[in-house]
C-alpha cells in the first residue's frame, strides 16, 4: 500500500521503516471491489492491517521527506514534464501506493491531475485530510479498478516492495500497462539488494507491531520484467542513500514508456 518509512518514505528494510503496496481497486487476482474489500490475498490483508496500524507514525516520518531527496524530486519533475509534453497540461496520472499523499501532492503542484491509490484505508483517509483537493481511493495495484487507458502515466514510488512473488510483480505491471494510455510513462522506484533479489520480514516498524515482508530488487531483473510487460525502458538509475535522511539502502529507478497491445499477465 504505502511507501516505506524511516527518514524516507520508502518502505522496507531489515527491521522496518515502512512500506506498502499501493494500488487501486480490484479487478484481477481475486481482489474484491474495494470500497469495502470483502477478500484480499492473506499477505495483502497483512499489509493493509500493518499500515492501518502504523499510519500516525508513518505520516510523521515521511510527510516532508521529498524536501531532503533532491534526486527523487528531480526524477518526479522529469516524469511530470515528459507526461505533460506528451499529453498536455493537467494530464492524469496514478500514484500507486500513495500512502499519505505527499508524492501525489508534489506531482499535482507540477500541474498533473493525480489519483492516489493505496491498500490501507487509514492511509487514504489521512491523505484525503492532508490534501483535500486531490483524489484518493483504496485499492490494490495488482487489480486496478480503473478503465483501460485511464491514465497518461503512473508512478510506483517505493510501493511494489511488498509484492514478494514474481507473479504479483507481473500482475501489477500488467495492470499498469492496461491502465496507462499508449506512450504514457511509468516510473518505478525500489530498494536494491546487495546480492540481487531478496526478501526480509519485519515484525516492527516505527515502534509499531506489524507483519510485513519487504522485497529488495535486482534492477536488471525488474527492468526486464517491465520491458516484458509491454514498456520500452528509457532510463535506469541507481543511487546511494542520503545519510541521516532515509534507510541506508541503495535505490533503483526505472522510467519506461508504454508501447504495444495489452497482454494479461
Residue spans of the language-model regions?
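A conserved beta-strand element that flanks and buttresses the S-adenosyl-L-methionine
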Residues: 155-156
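Core SAM-dependent methyltransferase catalytic element
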Residues: 244-265
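Short alpha-helix
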Residues: 214-229
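A short glycine-rich, Lys/Arg-flanked "PGG" loop and its adjoining helix->strand segment in the class I
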Residues: 170-182
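Class I SAM-dependent methyltransferase SAM/SAH-binding core
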Residues: 92-143
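Conserved S-adenosyl-L-methionine
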Residues: 231-242
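Conserved class I S-adenosyl-L-methionine
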Residues: 30, 34-88, 185-213
Amino acid at each position: 500500500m504505502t511507501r516505506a518509512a524511516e527518514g524516507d518514505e520508502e518502505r522496507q528494510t531489515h527491521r522496518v521503516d515502512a512500506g506498502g503496496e499501493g494500488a487501486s481497486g480490484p479487478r484481477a487476482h481475486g481482489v474484491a471491489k474495494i470500497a469495502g474489500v470483502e477478500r484480499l490475498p492473506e499477505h495483502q490483508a497483512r499489509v493493509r492491517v500493518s499500515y492501518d496500524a502504523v499510519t500516525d507514525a508513518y505520516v510523521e516520518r515521511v510527510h516532508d521527506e521529498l524536501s531532503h531527496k533532491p534526486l527523487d524530486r528531480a526524477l518526479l519533475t522529469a516524469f511530470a514534464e515528459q507526461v505533460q509534453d506528451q499529453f498536455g497540461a493537467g494530464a492524469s496520472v496514478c500514484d500507486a501506493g500513495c500512502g499519505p499523499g505527499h508524492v501525489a501532492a508534489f506531482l499535482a503542484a507540477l500541474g498533473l491531475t493525480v489519483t492516489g491509490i493505496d491498500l490501507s484505508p487509514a492511509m487514504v483517509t489521512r491523505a484525503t485530510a492532508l490534501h483535500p483537493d486531490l483524489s484518493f481511493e483504496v485499492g490494490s495495484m495488482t487489480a486496478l479498478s480503473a478503465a483501460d487507458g485511464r491514465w497518461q502515466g503512473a508512478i510506483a514510488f517505493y510501493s511494489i516492495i511488498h509484492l514478494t512473488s514474481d507473479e504479483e510483480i507481473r500482475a501489477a505491471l500488467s495492470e499498469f500497462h492496461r491502465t496507462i494510455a499508449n506512450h504514457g510513462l511509468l516510473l518505478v522506484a525500489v530498494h536494491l539488494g546487495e546480492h540481487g533479489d531478496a526478501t526480509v520480514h519485519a515484525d516492527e516498524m516505527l515502534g509499531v507491531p506489524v507483519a510485513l515482508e519487504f522485497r529488495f530488487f535486482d534492477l536488471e531483473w525488474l527492468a526486464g520484467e517491465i520491458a516484458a510487460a509491454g514498456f520500452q525502458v528509457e532510463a535506469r538509475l541507481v543511487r546511494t542513500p542520503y545519510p541521516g535522511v532515509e534507510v541506508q539502502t541503495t535505490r533503483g529507478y526505472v522510467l519506461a514508456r508504454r508501447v504495444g497491445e495489452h497482454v494479461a499477465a
